[in-house]
């Protein structure tokens, strides 16, 4: 057995504590760059990104609202959050394939239940409108998952009117 074989470890893409901790650095960066932020909206697939961001923000500024967004056709964490139980969907369908997750993370579910204020869903048409709006207004090309926070803001899914709000526009690589 080689030295590399001894140290091989499969790292879960979203349900790993170190992955979530690393993604929490985004929350720290938000607080550093916009100290008076009032709300942060984050896309959700399995929940790793929002878990880290929410934990970091709520640890330092518990009054800041942290919201999650999922595609309506792949709303596994939305369902778990609102039903107050961890569960798996039978089917997911969305062009926002990066967040098309049937089973959310167990560790992420625990953190989200504790630190996230609410989770909403957006339709495929709302995601498409957000993608086009980002292109037209910001000259930014985002894939479907990354545009879900903007869709939630554009279509008034959350109580953020008049609040200093950050939409985390992320995506697959």
Residue ranges of predicted features:
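PLP-dependent amino-acid enzyme catalytic core
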Residues: 1-173
């Amino acid at each position: 057995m080689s030295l590399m074989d001894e140290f091989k470890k499969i790292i879960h893409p979203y349900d790993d504590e170190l992955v979530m901790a690393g993604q929490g650095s985004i929350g720290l960066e938000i607080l550093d760059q916009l100290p008076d932020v009032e709300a942060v909206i984050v896309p959700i697939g399995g929940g790793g990104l929002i878990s880290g961001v929410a934990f970091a923000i709520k640890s330092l500024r518990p009054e800041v609202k942290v919201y999650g967004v999922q595609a309506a056709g792949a709303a596994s964490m939305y369902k778990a959050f609102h039903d107050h139980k961890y569960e798996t969907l039978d089917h997911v369908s969305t062009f926002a394939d990066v967040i098309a997750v049937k089973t959310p993370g167990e560790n992420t579910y625990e953190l989200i239940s504790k630190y996230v204020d609410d989770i909403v869903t957006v339709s495929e048409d709302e995601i498409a409108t957000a993608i086009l709006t980002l292109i037209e207004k910001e000259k930014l090309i985002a894939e479907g998952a990354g545009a879900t926070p903007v869709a939630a803001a554009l279509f008034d899914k959350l109580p953020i009117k008049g609040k200093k709000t950050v939409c985390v526009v992320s995506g697959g690589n």
